[in-house]
Amino acid sequence: MSVLVGLHGEAGSGKDTVAKLIIDWCNDTYPTCLSRRYSFAKPVYELASVILGVTPEFLGERRGKEIDQWFTVTQSQLERARDVWFKYGIDKFEDFSYVWPIFEEKYLNPQQLISENKEDGLYSLFISPRKMLQLVGTELGRQLVHERIWLIILEQSIAKDDPDVAVITDVRFPNEGELLRETNHLDMDSLLVNVVPAEQKFTIKSDHPSESGIPAKYITHELVNKFDGINNLKLEVYNFCDLELEPLVG
């Protein structure tokens, strides 16, 4: 039976590391098992990175993710963003050329837009990578396009791959929890794990809706990250997988 494993938790709680360890467990325990890692935010990272003219990896670097910095937005970058829009089928819900000016005026102007005089440069934007990701994911995608846009894209991706184990690293919104536990159309068993840091000093606080949590009724398990070394975390994750995941996969 195929299994959908969702990970929930505050920013900085270690969800990505836990996801990697679950995939490692799958490879170690069931070498022929097809296990894949997924993220609701993958198209968000791709869109935000081309808009800002950087790589998705740059936006994901924790050391600079919270720091406001200057980015130059160019016409060619917006054209590439439109290509990403088409790549993920977002144009089936809203046209990029219609939605972008609304988003730009309502949400980017407050982030200190300064007009550029350089050729092809439209303006400079002073913003942190995390804030840009939040705006693209929630205000642009969920509010201006469709509340379920990132869920729809992820469901299509999982259905296409047809993995034995799909690990979703970033379950943040109530309808994402609902997708895993109540309304998924993928014919997969599901677990939703809350990754909890033993000490709150490791997490990153935010009042953005994407960090407000999901209803407890969707959470099936809790895994405590003590931040006491990768080997200890591996033991915790492997023990969890032996007890909870193996009966569903085996």
Curated annotation (Swiss-Prot):
Keywords: ATP-binding, DNA replication, Early protein, Kinase, Nucleotide-binding, Transferase, Viral DNA replication. GO terms for biological process: DNA replication; viral DNA genome replication. Allows the synthesis of deoxyribonucleoside triphosphates necessary for the rapid viral DNA replication. Phosphorylates all four dNMPs. The enzyme had the highest activity with dAMP and had about 30% less activity with dTMP and dGMP, respectively. The lowest activity was observed with dCMP as the substrate (about 35% of that with dAMP). Changing S13A: About 5-50% loss of enzyme activity depending on the substrate. Its EC number is 2.7.4.13. Pfam families: DNMK. Changing T17S: About 5-50% loss of enzyme activity depending on the substrate. Changing Q134A: About 75-95% loss of enzyme activity depending on the substrate. Induction: Expressed in the early phase of the viral replicative cycle. This is Deoxynucleoside-5'-monophosphate kinase. Optimum pH is 7.0-7.5. Gene3D superfamilies: P-loop containing nucleotide triphosphate hydrolases (3.40.50.300). Changing G137A: Almost complete loss of enzyme activity. It catalyses: a 2'-deoxyribonucleoside 5'-phosphate + ATP = a 2'-deoxyribonucleoside 5'-diphosphate + ADP. ATP binds at G14, D16, T17. Belongs to the dNMP kinase family.
